[in-house]
């Protein structure tokens, strides 16, 4: 059972599917009727007029009507479009159990606890017939789907079949019916002869709750309180019981025939739904609920859907999945239909059956895996109990007879899923969830241990995708290892693109699109179930939900292409065609409009010519495209879609197109628009539009200030007059201040009663007459004349030297693709093209270099774009002043043609930009980046400051090798020298200014070179090994690493190299020493002992300890020799070495003394001086190499390090820097 939809509500007593729309009506025990969309899983409407439980409910087949009957004795007819009850039919005297529409006539059939069945005419709104005869509650009554029959079930333990052909004949003259009914108002309980009982079916031992006709056969099914489901057959003369289905252990509430299969469904108060095989009369499936009793069942008239109502709501379900099993390879589709494997050629549309499948499984094929190399298929079948799942391996016959195809012998085995992994191997996930690899004979070739998984999918040759509860893992079957994984729960289907570069992972409500390495590119959530998908050749994923065909681009953009009536399963997408299978396994081709996703794809891939073509020719409309373009940063493109002025205005502002914004603002004439336009125009320095905006919004203060800063005194005076007319004293005075008009200020102050201020203003500014006349107006008794400040300074606004008449000059930026091309559609389109053609000459670098300047350096008046400048001299070109003869100094006498012809004018080359190598140096403090840029001097300085390098001779070869990798070279034109490319390691986000060079040397390369050094050490080539270790050590400062772990690994690499170089140097020096005297022999033993304290690999440590052991044993220093023997045995040497060591150890332990005193204390930690090869015990002063960390006695400070041969011992440095992280 596949649950498609579930609701939680009061007890559901009635259910009805809409014949066409994905709707279902539920009538509840609390009096509410609910209308649900089971595909979208939403409640559409509620109808609440009944008083008490509603038991009967039914949709009309054609009209927007449904009927309901309740415990309030009322039958109500509703119009769901108008969302109201149209009328109520009264007549029943007790609860109404069921109500059904007739499939043809305007009749409603109702069954009631008043022991009658009534037929109503919903057009005339009257009762046309009463069927009496039952002597207990009538629990159910239904029309026959094609004949004039009614079946009813009653608690009187009978099922009755009624013949209503008399009613139908009578119904042809409606008047007769009405008069008849009116004439029997007193005795209508006893009915008329319009309907007669044809058969009475007795056989149930208790009350019958439900009876229903078979849609096509003369059969009736009934369910009763005796816990039995009975099947009855009838003919014209009689009806009889055929069989009984036993299994329910409580009252059977409802029983229906499956509309298209030989099945019966029943449900019961025992909290179960049971499916019975009609031919075998046995139970096929049982579905149980824990706490809810079932009350009603409904079958969809056209689809394989059922609904069941229970105590806590209802469920819509299918008995089995309807998804066809199919596999696509190239132009071929293989799919399973009616126990045949069929093959469809997409190109020729030829559809043939190639093979008959063996029968036996009662479950449909779950999925299919096709092997084109061997022309073989794997068909997997899922049982309700997963452990019983099987798969079949078939080889498709070469020359199949399409009319009567063969049924080749298939190989069947148990397993959840089988998938091809190679030409002749397939993987099986068995019931224990382990992976088996089998060959074409279905024999196991090997078992593979895999991480916990419950499903497997194909992932290319040798690879599988493994599904667990919350992720998908890419698994290499050959190497038996996990390659990658991505988080997504319960993936159902996996669809690879044709080139296997992308994969779509489909879950119930989600799609994750990943690349080949399983890096998630985008995650899409859907509210409706995702059904299927296929990749378009352009790299767009086309997928279907229950009700839409949609697209998804790998960047995450997705949208709807078209709506679907019924779910389909996409098999292939090519051009405008979507090839698919429907639920009846019929191949179909749907046409789609790919414009929207092609448009978005072109934008994402920056194919602007395609975008422009679509803008001009395609019917791309709608707010979503505009919003998309705006969101993605293409407002200038969106501008050409928009007709709405408000949207045009906001888009124009966003892309800085003041002209279009001004047009839109004029059309809208809204204060807010003018204010916004003013702000943007001000930012661009377009003060003429700013002035217009301030005038439109009457923003006089800002307008005055604009005139002040542009030096437009004439208009400022007008503003002062306007302020005076408006009686705006403050504005009037402010404008007078801006203008520096003292007499006006005195007048304003005098008029507004500020005599003291007016007097001070006049007197301070030397307006003596005015001051005197004001002085006389003061009353000496009441008013004091204010004192004039003798130190007053004149505050006067500066006089404008050059009033700004034109707008602020803007840089000529290169127009975007769209602005340039779309602008050329307008008036100057052809002209623009001509000018471009004419001016692409040798001087094409800069027309702006030809401005004529006057002696003050300003543009001459003729350079403006006034009418006079354009009007004259157009024929001769005189307005450009390029024909004038200038007297040039003789040294500038250049031969004609040298600069591209006399008429070309003076050419100013563009200023040189910063070279990529200089950018590298500017952006990085890592030495290797400076070496790659060729800046050896700065690289040396960095190495000196960071790790103390003072001797650069050994670095010469490394520098040159590294620099050689810093650039690529390629031939452009045959006549030109080679061009250089400068590859960046951060090329994805480098831009023009943030690049840093690609580095050839990797940490892993050095680690691999370390293995060679170990081999040289093992075979005893010490001097060669020391050279190789030193080469690695010197290369470490020339690395670039990305994380802290790699920094730590690099420092560990330095430590390893130091330990080996010091130790091997000690050993080399020891071997050179003479052995004549006792002192010389003691020195040899000391150096061998020191070597055992180097931190070496165990294999080398064994060799070192064996050497020291032999030397000390010969010197008769048995006590020390015993310690070396014990250390040697702890390392686990070979058996023969261990045996000899134990012999020496036992000899030493018999006499545990040292014959001679040596400068070696094994119990006191020490470092070896890398110059003198003597121990520096802990606590003694020590100097270190800043790069390798090698230890030296203080007397060696300032000398060259013996380990690195390039650094200064004891130098104070910043420290090793090989990652940008170390500078944060």
Curated annotation (Swiss-Prot):
Keywords: Cytoplasm, Cytoplasmic vesicle, Disease variant, ER-Golgi transport, Golgi apparatus, Hormone, Membrane, Methylation, Phosphoprotein, Protein transport, Repeat, Secreted, Transport, WD repeat. The keyword Protein transport applies. GO terms for cellular component: COPI vesicle coat; cytoplasm; cytosol; endoplasmic reticulum membrane; extracellular exosome; extracellular space; Golgi membrane; growth cone. Its main location: cytoplasm. It is a peripheral membrane protein. This is Coatomer subunit alpha. Oligomeric complex that consists of at least the alpha, beta, beta', gamma, delta, epsilon and zeta subunits. Interacts with SCYL1. Interacts with JAGN1. Interacts with TMEM41B. Interacts with SVEP1. Probably interacts with PEX11A. It holds the Pfam family TPR_COPA_B. It is linked to Autoinflammation and autoimmunity, systemic, with immune dysregulation: An autoinflammatory disorder with systemic manifestations. Clinical features include inflammatory arthritis, interstitial lung disease, alveolar hemorrhage, neuromyelitis optica, and immune complex-mediated renal disease. AIAISD inheritance is autosomal dominant with incomplete penetrance. The modification Phosphothreonine is found at residues 185, 591. It is found in: Cytoplasm; Golgi apparatus membrane; Cytoplasmic vesicle, COPI-coated vesicle membrane. CDD domains: Coatomer_WDAD_alpha, WD40. Uniformly expressed in a wide range of adult and fetal tissues. Xenin is found in gastric, duodenal and jejunal mucosa. Circulates in the blood. Seems to be confined to specific endocrine cells. SMART domains: WD40. The coatomer is a cytosolic protein complex that binds to dilysine motifs and reversibly associates with Golgi non-clathrin-coated vesicles, which further mediate biosynthetic protein transport from the ER, via the Golgi up to the trans Golgi network. Coatomer complex is required for budding from Golgi membranes, and is essential for the retrograde Golgi-to-ER transport of dilysine-tagged proteins. It comes from the Eukaryota. WD repeats lie at residues 3-38, 42-80, 84-122, 126-164, 195-234, 241-278, 282-319. Changing residue 164 to V: In RNA edited version. It comes from Homo sapiens (Human). The lineage of its organism: Eukaryota, Metazoa, Chordata, Craniata, Vertebrata. GO terms for biological process: endoplasmic reticulum to Golgi vesicle-mediated transport; intra-Golgi vesicle-mediated transport; intracellular protein transport; pancreatic juice secretion; protein localization to axon; protein localization to cell leading edge; retrograde vesicle-mediated transport, Golgi to endoplasmic reticulum. One of its GO terms (molecular function) is mRNA binding. The modification Phosphoserine is found at residues 173, 402, 895, 1193.
